[in-house]
Amino acid sequence: NQGQETRAVSNVSYAIAPGETVGLVGESGSGKSVSALSILKLLPPSARISQGSISFEGRDISGLDSAALQNLRGNDIAMIFQEPMTSLNPLHSIEKQISECLEIHQEISGDDLDPKTGRTPIRTRVLDLLYKVGIPDAEKRLSALPHELSGGQRQRVMIAMALANNPKLLIADEPTTALDVTVQK
């Protein structure tokens, strides 16, 4: 009902140590995605965290302003979203989208050419990430737009973007949902 409060998640608490992998398991609609999105304050405008706190590395991050949150996202905490087509910009190449992650958070220049490879440091890093996540012929895929990739390849691009800045905490919201048959060996 409109105007009525609905509690999506209640009394959630978990602690994740460095290097630890934690899986949040529950039935559909149980609040797994809401819990993940709330950590980075990515909930829709109508949602709110009514009580409690969110701590990362011993500090409360639930009250951070936009600039501090932007710095935290990508640098320290990254997220792999469930549906890459809603997260990737349909008008930009995958190289541009991964490069932006690096430019914003690591201040790597895209201007200087490496005399040995003939590539910029950003392009070298983007290619490295694409190869690591299993994108075949990564160099040929740099200029591809998201709709030109398979669902599995788009998911891999999302994973590459999340890993780009070596985050301390990686949140994955059903990251294998769209992966293709090539990883099911």
State what each model feature region is.
Residues I61-A78, K96, I104, R119:
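ABC ATPase NBD coupling module
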Residues A164-K168:
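A short, proline-enriched helix->beta-strand linker immediately N-terminal to the Walker B motif
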Residues A144-L149, Q153:
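Conserved ABC ATPase signature
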Residues D60, D114-K140:
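Conserved ABC ATPase "signature" region
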Residues I49-D60:
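Conserved ABC transporter NBD signature motif
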Residues I98, I159, L170, V183:
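Hydrophobic anchor residue at the start of the ABC signature
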Residues N1-N11, L42-R48, D65-A68, L91, ...:
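A short, flexible loop at the N-terminus of ABC-type nucleotide-binding domains that lies
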